Amino acid sequence: MKKLRRSSLSEDAYTFVRALFLKGDRYSPGDKISVEELSRELGVSRTPLWGAIYRLEAEGIVEIVPRLGVYLVDYDPKKVIEIYVAREALEGVAARLAAERITERQIAALQANIDLQRAHLKQGEIDKYYAAALDFHEEIVAIAGSKTIGRLLGSIFAQIKAMRVQRNYAPMHLPQSCDDHERLLAEFRRRNPETAEHEARRHIRDLADEIRRSLPERAISSPRARGRAVVS
């Protein structure tokens, strides 16, 4: 594993470890993470690594269980739906704000993004489609101009990336998502905050419904639950 540079260790550790956890190659949902092992591999002290871990806990990517350690969060069905309920509310407000301030250049950029999404789907490039679709949503949040909403949705988007790796979602109605994006963009062109919020919320609600149908109806043990068993 590549060792980190001595300058800006805290930010480098956060960036590296976040990417490592989201990628899904090394850790599986619910796995315990050894901070000591990562410290040796990266050639840094545990202090910047713990700083990164605390930030990732705030984002909902890891769970710190007292006296037991750090675990990669396992997204059970209930947690997944909770995340999408929050996403619906926040993206609805972001769309409303974006409709009030969006420029013609930004509209053109969003249209180009949708065209890219459709091109990726046509080529069967599902991972690239997901990346472009997330860029679309992130750009709307940026246009909205709210740092608070941006920070909260940044955490949610990170968790969605992790869920996609963990659950290996199968593509089902992705062309419909592109159509939803087109409808939302149409409301931006009209500079209509109310209907933009409506379209954004409906789109996220439809995604949540599809995910709800695809998730298994089973309880997945959390690190905290496993911890109680270990303690007893």
Where are these predicted regions, by residue range?
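Alpha-helix N-cap/N′ positions at the starts of helices
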Residues: I33, R67, L90, A109-A112, ...
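Short linear motifs at protein or domain termini
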Residues: M1-R96, E100, R212-S232
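C-terminal-biased regions
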Residues: R26-Y27, D31, V35, R55, ...
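Conserved amphipathic alpha-helical segments that form helical-bundle/coiled-coil interaction surfaces
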Residues: K79, I83, E104-V165, D179-E187, ...
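Juxtamembrane/interface motifs at transmembrane-helix termini
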Residues: R5, W50, R101-E104, K128-A131, ...
